[in-house]
Amino acid sequence: LDFDAASDEESLLTFRNTFGPDSFAWEEARAVFIGLDDVIYQPGTKPAYIGGLRDDQFNFLEAYLPTVPKDRLLVLGVHIPLFDAKPGIETFRKTDRARLFALLKDFPHVLLLSGHDHTQRHVRHGAENDWHGATPLHEYNVGAACGAFWSGVKDAAGIPDSTMSDGTPNGYA
């Protein structure tokens, strides 16, 4: 995310020029993997971003998902979790979450992987979060290999242990 960009679209240019598309999919024998940039940059606001999806991403999903066999494992990777990380504060746009969940509800095997929070957490989405699939949707908030950035008790060399808030040590995600 380029915080110097004038718009959400411009904030993705460096990523796209370095790595390629910010929305993509690939298929393996029994699984389909979808990666989506779900960071919506809002220049000049506080906070400067919110979790959500763009119209072009929904267009991609609406065109692609009908081609995916329902017996495949569907793995979605995003950055910002789809659950609201802070009670009472919308950290992922509810309308986008409901729209995404409506597209996924007929897939019986879905795993949602998210990051951003530098902690590990398992969330089971149900009707209270607009998930209407046959079973709860499993979201695994993976944590971060860097741990909790440069925080925590310092070792003899002055390097902090960076243990995540859930107790996961640096280097494990």
Outline where the language-model segments fall.
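Extended active-site neighborhood of metal-dependent phosphoesterases/phosphodiesterases
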Residues: 1-70, 90-113, 119-172
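Short acidic, glycine-rich surface-loop motifs adjacent to enzyme active sites
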Residues: 65-86
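Alpha-helix capping/helix-boundary segments
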Residues: 82, 118-119
